Design a protein with these regions (language model features):
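Short glycine/proline-enriched, acidic/aromatic patches that form the donor-sugar handling elements
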Residues: 5-8, 26, 47-53, 69
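A short, well-ordered alpha-helix in the C-terminal region of glycosyltransferases
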Residues: 70, 77, 84-98, 105-111, ...
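Conserved active-site histidine-acidic residue motif and adjacent donor-binding/catalytic loop
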Residues: 1-11, 22, 66
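C-terminal amphipathic helix plus adjacent low-complexity
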Residues: 98, 103-144
Length: 144
């Protein structure tokens, strides 16, 4: 097994991370790790974290899980266009460090807990990011 430091080092060298998990993955914290390492991610739409972390064409690419041709096209685009690869990697890093970080999660958890203890409606506290409402997603949430 690799140490967390070794994993991080490999991700930072990789440039691109393929997140091909399906609905059995749950959240898939490795996506957070890859984005925090500055990888341009290509993520399947069926994994739990994808709709919350990856904005297709802005901070990564999303493909329909199981569509190998679409996965190939998204990866090929990043390989053929290093500037887009770098831009996605930088935007992914900013997504994690700017919003989906431990400090924000801890602060929001405390605010959420206090709201619940006070009997207030906590569903409107945060529009996105940690502790925001996560409604059920339809299987076809991602459209090309």
């Amino acid at each position: 097994a690799m140490s967390p430091e070794d994993v991080r080092r490999h991700m930072e060298k990789a440039g691109i991370y393929l997140f091909t998990s399906d609905r059995q993955e749950g959240w898939g914290a490795v996506l957070n790790e890859a984005m925090n390492s500055g990888c341009a991610v290509v993520a399947g739409d069926a994994a739990g974290a994808t709709p919350f972390l990856v904005q297709d064409g802005a901070n990564g690419s999303v493909y329909h899980s199981g569509d190998v041709q679409e996965l190939y096209e998204k990866v090929r685009r990043l390989l053929d266009d290093p500037s887009t690869q770098r831009a996605f990697g930088s935007a992914a890093y900013r997504t994690i460090t700017g919003l989906w970080n431990a400090e924000t999660a801890a602060e929001r958890f405390l605010q959420l807990s206090q709201a619940l203890l006070d009997g207030r409606d906590a569903t409107k506290l945060f529009a996105d990011g940690p502790c925001s409402p996560a409604s059920l997603l339809r299987e076809d949430w991602y459209r090309k």
